[in-house]
Amino acid sequence: STATAVVADVTQKENRSKGMVFVGIAFAFGFILGPAIGGLSAKINLMEYFPSLIKYGLNPFSTPALIACVLSCINLVFLTLKFKESLPPEKRGESINDRSFNPIKLFRPLPYPGVNLTNIGHFLFLMAFSGMEFTLTFLAFERMAYTPMDNAYMFIFIGFIIALVQGGYVRRKAGIIGEKSMSLRGLALLIPGLILIGLAESSFILYVGLAFLATGSSLIIPCLTSLVSIYTPSQYQGQSIGIFRSLGALARVIGPIVASITYWRYGSAVPYFSGAIFLLIPLYMLSKLPQPKLA
């Protein structure tokens, strides 16, 4: 949420979606490099080199976990030393003191037209999408006997599509087509993607479904973030985008739980088919969004 708030601070409304795309591209490269690093480093079994540490929790996946920890520490040090406040003092809003750890309060209406529908639509979309993400490796192993390296290739493919679509299409066309229309197109692409994955019995069908999903999410995420930012006054960007991202994080908690229970209780296809139907709700909600005013 901090990264997107910074983009909102330093871009004009008419260029907001282009700025958000760069955040999306960064995440896409994370999708490409992260699984590649994880898949390759998983082949290094630290238990063979440090057997005395097994009693302290060392396991076959400790190497990728250790690399992730080191990268997180580097990121923390870099941000501590280099990150500066991006919003000028005269544009900053007053501090909000009525913060709460109650997730229900995230759904409390905000007084900015369009923000509430966007927030709820984003929450519902991410519930379905994160459920797919979480159960995807289960399905790939159950139906096609995918190994950890096969899973890495799968997520590299997703990241490549996201980077290609956001860098080559969304960045150029979002300002012309409009963030609302592009978000609706993205949601519409997710539906056949989920259905194809639910039907997949071969890698070819699986990858076709993943291409739909990656393309759809590439359109939705930067455009919805941009819409929330455009609908919100500049001095409240951090608050509004923070709530938007918090609802996304909550969806990423609920979605995998529901999808996993559905997967193991009712079968591997059910969470994907039900997710496709469920996406009709945010598709309808987002179609009711007001056209953003860029002036």
Q: What are the roles of these predicted feature ranges?
A:
Residues 69-91, 282-289:
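C-terminal membrane-cytosol helix-exit motif in multi-pass small-molecule transporters
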Residues 18-43, 247-255:
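Glycine-rich segments within core transmembrane alpha-helices of 12-TM secondary carriers
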Residues 165, 178-224:
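C-terminal transmembrane helical hairpin of 12-TM major facilitator-type secondary transporters
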Residues 134-154:
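Short amphipathic helix-loop junctions that connect adjacent transmembrane helices
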Residues 43-69, 261-279:
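A membrane-interface helix-boundary motif in multi-pass transporters
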